[in-house]
Amino acid sequence: MARSSKKNPFVANHLLSKIEKLNKAEERSIIVTWSRASTIIFAMVGHTIAVHNGKEHLPIYITERMVGHKLGEFAPTLTFRGHARNDNRSRR
């Protein structure tokens, strides 16, 4: 279900304050965050945000096409290692 249009998009307070501080100083540096649920807003465009995937922080460069999506969408948490082997030998 989508978020109500009456509400603003969710962005973690600590992340929003870091973005505003960097925009005010016109700096570009990597911002480390664990907040995968934060929505990407237009103020984040051009920044690199390192999003935690459960093991490490993956750097993600924010573009205009990403606005409106969540940060967690761009940091996959699962690694596919292939399907299980056919174990017909053990069944005999």
UniProtKB/Swiss-Prot annotation:
Example GO molecular function: rRNA binding
GO biological process assignments: ribosomal small subunit assembly; translation
Location in or out of the cell: Plastid, Chloroplast
Keywords tagged on the record: Chloroplast, Plastid, Ribonucleoprotein, Ribosomal protein, RNA-binding, rRNA-binding
A GO CC annotation given for this chain: chloroplast
InterPro entries: Ribosomal_uS19 (IPR002222), Ribosomal_uS19_bac-type (IPR005732), Ribosomal_uS19_CS (IPR020934), Ribosomal_uS19_SF (IPR023575)
Lineage top rank: taxon: Eukaryota
Main location per the UniProt record: plastid
Cysteine disulfide links: none
Family to which the UniProt record says this protein belongs: Belongs to the universal ribosomal protein uS19 family.
Function: Protein S19 forms a complex with S13 that binds strongly to the 16S ribosomal RNA.
Protein name: Small ribosomal subunit protein uS19c
Organism: Nymphaea alba
Gene name per UniProt: rps19
